[in-house]
Regions:
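Glycoside hydrolase catalytic-domain context in secreted enzymes
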Residues: 1-318
Length: 318
């Protein structure tokens, strides 16, 4: 069934799925949104039952406004108070971070919201993180596994996350978004992840979209560069491969083109994972998309989020 569906998509449609990872509601300080406690405050409760309920509340609100994915939670480690996004991450303790992250993801995804947990992994500073080539992070394998990867592993194994957001830093000298070992060997083959991935927002020139696609990072979440690569400049030629069609990519100097079957395969594989993540979310509502979900919600500073959108909320389906 999936083969038949993917065969029906044009090259342009496959490219759009890869390059169209941005959009939707935005930001922790968005006007008109719901204000929640900061993530370290949540971790300070040590209350996984409470965090699971909060995840369900996130999911309920997403259902009401028509969202099927959440670019979160952020689960990097508080390596330093000067991290830059410490307010967005749970703790300096990997066990506490992993425990909180797994249950809030599990709660949110119980409502059909795909959680693109971020930023996998070792994203420990913001300065030089993206604009100047990606900071190089070095550690032993034990340190990476026990501290910086644990929350992401637990969100896959116990939170059953349907998404993952990668980071712009480098592991050693290799850009995380372009790292085959991170995406295919660790995330999918070892941890058993079956969802889709997205890179961090606004990729710079050092993030090769071509290598990103081939490494198994499925979606580009916006870019303010030309990202000159086969992804956007490759052209479909229906006459190739005995009439089955294939992609013509430009040579390095741009004066000629060559046939690249491997590039088509990588693009198709990522596009299929993106589509599978969508149909496993609430976007299609089990293909009963002609109904409308509404609820009576009170607004105002005095209104508690638990009252507004707790599990006891009465939803009206029309």
């Amino acid at each position: 069934l999936w083969d038949s569906y993917m065969n029906s998509l044009t090259w342009e449609e496959l490219v759009k799925l890869f390059t169209d990872g941005d959009g939707g509601k935005d930001g922790p300080v968005q006007f008109g949104g719901t204000c929640w406690q900061s993530t370290p405050i949540a971790a300070a409760t040590w209350n996984i039952e409470l965090l699971e309920e909060q995840g369900k509340m996130y999911g309920n609100q997403a259902l009401l406004v028509g969202l099927f994915s959440w670019r979160g939670p952020g689960t990097n480690i508080h390596r330093s108070p000067f991290n830059g996004r410490t307010f967005e991450y749970y703790s300096e303790d990997p066990f506490l971070t992993a425990s909180m992250a797994a249950v809030i993801v599990d709660g949110c995804q119980s409502k059909g919201v795909s959680c693109f947990a971020k930023h996998m992994f070792a994203n420990v500073q913001e300065y030089n993180r993206a604009d100047y080539g990606g900071v190089c992070t070095f550690a032993t394998e034990q340190v990476f596994r026990e501290i910086y990867q644990r929350s992401f592993e637990w969100m896959v194994k116990y939170g059953h996350t349907n998404g993952m957001m990668t980071s712009f830093n480098r592991v050693g000298y290799v850009v995380n978004s372009n790292n085959w070992a991170v995406h295919e060997e660790l995330l999918r083959n070892e941890w058993g992840f079956t969802g889709a991935t997205v890179d961090d927002a606004w990729a710079k020139d050092f993030v090769s979209c071509d290598l990103m696609l081939r490494a198994g990072d499925d979606t580009l979440m916006g870019s303010d560069t030309a990202h000159k690569c086969y992804v956007t400049v490759g052209q479909w030629d229906a006459s190739l491969r005995d009439g089955k069609g294939d992609v013509l990519c430009p040579t390095e100097d741009g004066d000629d083109t060559f046939e690249s079957t491997t590039h088509y395969y990588a693009m198709r594989k990522s596009a299929q994972r993106i589509q599978q993540a969508k149909v496993n979310s609430n976007q299609y509502k089990n293909f009963a998309s002609d109904f409308e979900l509404t609820a009576t919600v009170s607004y105002g500073l005095a209104n508690a989020a638990q009252i507004a959108c707790a599990e006891t909320t009465d939803f009206n389906v029309t």
